[in-house]
């Protein structure tokens, strides 16, 4: 493990992703599985690869990810956030374009808590006039 590697932590909803960028040929491994087997949907794979495609570093780094918590969309967003942070650590000149695309900003939207007297966060029990 004497190779140069760049670390980045990404978060989205309840998901946390620990990302390592290692010089390589663009292979993405998530929880020791290929990206194609981990994410069935093409849209999620596109979300994960967005920062690499935007900066033109897709073929320069192998991406090793450890992600837990949340669902598929949250995990994809967390991985994108982690990759972006690691890319900025590798090359500070990439910061402006990644910031402009909004990848450096942690998405603050979280699940709203359930309130008592209601069925869900905002869903009220059915109203009966009589």
Curated annotation (Swiss-Prot):
Protein's UniProt keywords contain Glycoprotein: no
Species: Clostridium botulinum (strain Alaska E43 / Type E3)
The protein, known as: Small ribosomal subunit protein uS9
UniProt keyword annotation of Metal-binding present: no
Segments of skewed composition (Basic residues): 111-130
Signal peptide: none
Listed GO CC annotations: cytosolic small ribosomal subunit
Gene3D superfamilies the UniProt entry points to: 3.30.230.10
Recorded superkingdom: Bacteria
GO MF, one example: structural constituent of ribosome
GO process annotations (BP): translation
Keywords: Ribonucleoprotein, Ribosomal protein
Compositional bias of kind Basic and acidic residues: 99-110
Similarity annotation: Belongs to the universal ribosomal protein uS9 family.
InterPro entries named in the record: Ribosomal_Su5_D2-typ_SF, Ribosomal_uS9, Ribosomal_uS9_bac/plastid, Ribosomal_uS9_CS, Ribsml_uS5_D2-typ_fold_subgr
PROSITE patterns on file: RIBOSOMAL_S9
Annotated segments matching region Disordered: 99-130
